[in-house]
């Protein structure tokens, strides 16, 4: 019996088997707006939407997408939406200083930079081909 074990397969299985169950509860007291409770189906929908957005930008498989986010539903969605469709996620610790984050973004080869809303002002001057505030 062949069992797929890639990231996309885990998401697809969770959506198929547990679709209506709660998959994540976002912290209500975080600095960025909370996404509340999301079912596995909703996580899958958000991940597909992110992947479609990256497709529309022309970001192909193997290209890097940097994300700086607290441990949140947004980070989980980025994990599946980026890695599940063949791109490389570059997770960056939100506790780093802006100069450290700039270094990682510039030296990672990321063409897309996803930023949590509460960090956007501090990271506004970091250059990347595509930069988006998530959430």
Name what the model sees in each region.
Residues 2, 10-12, 56-57, 84-135:
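Structural core segment of the AMP-binding/adenylate-forming
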Residues 23-72, 76-80, 97-102:
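Conserved AMP-binding/adenylate-forming core of the ANL superfamily
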Residues 19-21, 62, 128:
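A structure-centric signal for secondary-structure junctions around beta-strands
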Residues 6, 49, 74, 109, ...:
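Residue-level recognition of oxygen-bearing side chains
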Residues 19, 33, 87-91:
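Residue-level signal for pocket-adjacent positions within structured domains
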Residues 1-2, 41, 69, 92:
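Residue-level marker of alpha-helix boundaries and capping positions
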Residues 2-25:
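A short N-terminal helical cap/helix-turn-helix that marks the beginning
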